[in-house]
Amino acid sequence: MRNLEDMKKSDNIMSSDAKEGTENIPDIDKVISELVNYASENELIEADDKIFIVNRLLDIFEKNGLAEDSEIIKNSGVQELNNTRPIADILSDCLKIAVDNGLIEDTQLNRDLFDTKVMGAVTPMPSVVRKHFKELYNNNPKLATDYFYELNKACNYIRCDRIEKDQKWKYNSEYGIIDITINLSKPEKDPKDIIKQGKFAASGYPKCLLCKENEGYAGNLSHPARQNLRVIPLELSGEKYYMQYSPYVYYNEHCIVFNDKHIPMKINKSTFKKLIEFTDMFPHYTLGSNADLPIVGGSILSHDHFQGGAYEFPMARAEYVYTFK
């Protein structure tokens, strides 16, 4: 049997561990304040939106209010901060709070669903984004895409901390310079998530990852969250399309232009007209199409779409073998 002194030591150690664990959990009021400041600094929200956004975030964290000694209350609102941390660090604290309070299970899928929900609360409404994009486009198309691309990074739809893990290099082959990339930004699936996904009944809404209904969708075990996704409407050859950026950015400003309707990919004369019309609209961008053949792989053939961006592909640098008129 343990003597009284040993028991006291053990209790002290347990108390110390518990205290240390509590201290490691970020203060929710401070994290909310920092997140709202981040959104303001990155022009995701206006100053008049701050209190409204604080209350949206309190709802997400299932918190009824702020502590009486909260900086937000003491200063009668969210105060501007200097040197706001990168969004990945702020969201890391959000996830620690969510896990500690039992709001989510600590798996990669649940973490992604939750932090996307958080960012959705500070991402501008689609109408706001489209209006500003159009205003900039009327002045200069590049200004419009610059704004839209920076927005996607600021609202964490493009997860820059993950994109940085990708490996890219060039190889000087006998046929010319080859661009080689290894995409490491897609997180590995947690075994717990895989088991749950197998039991989850998908709703069929949205029909695929390229449907317009993804904009603002909360996601679930079989479909990623898209509360921070925003898309820009376009018209190509009389048909309605939308432009968004790829969250994985295989190359600079990797954009996706997808059909308003969930229809299969089909390469025909109209395809080339649409590609040319797009590059007329955005001269600083390239646009291309995957083959409509299943053997090629890698593309969502069930939904008509194109891919492009501000990138010079090796094919554009290749010499002509012959020319014809």
Give the label of every model feature segment.
Residues 21, 266, 284-287, 293-299, ...:
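Conserved His + Asp/Glu catalytic blocks
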Residues 2-265:
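Active-site microenvironments that recognize anionic phosphate/pyrophosphate groups
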Residues 182, 245, 289, 308-310:
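Hydrophobic side chains in beta-strands
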